[in-house]
Regions:
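Non-catalytic alpha-helical scaffolds and adjoining flexible linkers that form interface surfaces
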Residues: 1-159
Length: 159
């Protein structure tokens, strides 16, 4: 995760205004300045919030981004975490039954990758399989245990 500054982005004449919105997947060029990173140019690839099919899907997209902002700090590269998040945003922006169960699995995976949850606590059936390939009936069987491990990790992290 990287935070950067952009000047006059909210003005009507700004060319970067449309691309620099929350929940956008963008391609950006950055310059390291004295006070941090500065945005040079930006091009929007897609906005997962606006592409979401309904209110529940938009809520799931918001939860993914909030989770990342809450637990990820610093300027380290996490390729697997990035890929997992993009896959989850694609998955959650469409219609799904058992949405809460899938959200819990995604949260547990992210917290395990960041070291807040032991990898042994993640069910082996869920570790390497993309969200869209997990059957809903199996996902919801483990939901109570997954939700409990997430709650313990969030309390222990004090974030």
């Amino acid at each position: 995760m990287l935070y950067a500054d952009a000047r006059s982005v909210r003005t009507e004449a700004s060319k970067q205004r449309q691309a620099l919105q929350d929940f956008s997947f963008i391609r950006v060029s950055l310059v390291k300045g004295k006070g941090g990173w500065k945005i040079g140019s930006v091009a929007e690839t897609k906005n997962y919030y606006t592409l979401s099919v309904n209110q529940a899907a938009r809520g799931s997209v918001v939860k993914v981004i909030r989770l990342i902002r809450r637990f990820l700090a610093g300027e380290e590269m996490h390729h697997s975490l990035f890929d997992e998040c993009v896959t989850a945003l694609e998955f959650f922006s469409t219609e799904h039954a058992d949405r809460t169960c899938y959200e819990h699995i995604f949260t547990q995976r992210i917290l395990a990758q960041l070291g807040y949850i032991k990898l042994s606590d993640v069910p082996k059936d869920f570790t390497a399989v993309p969200l869209h390939e997990l059957p809903g009936d199996i996902v919801c069987v483990h939901d109570t245990a997954i939700a409990l491990s997430i709650k313990r990790a969030q309390n222990a992290s004090q974030l």
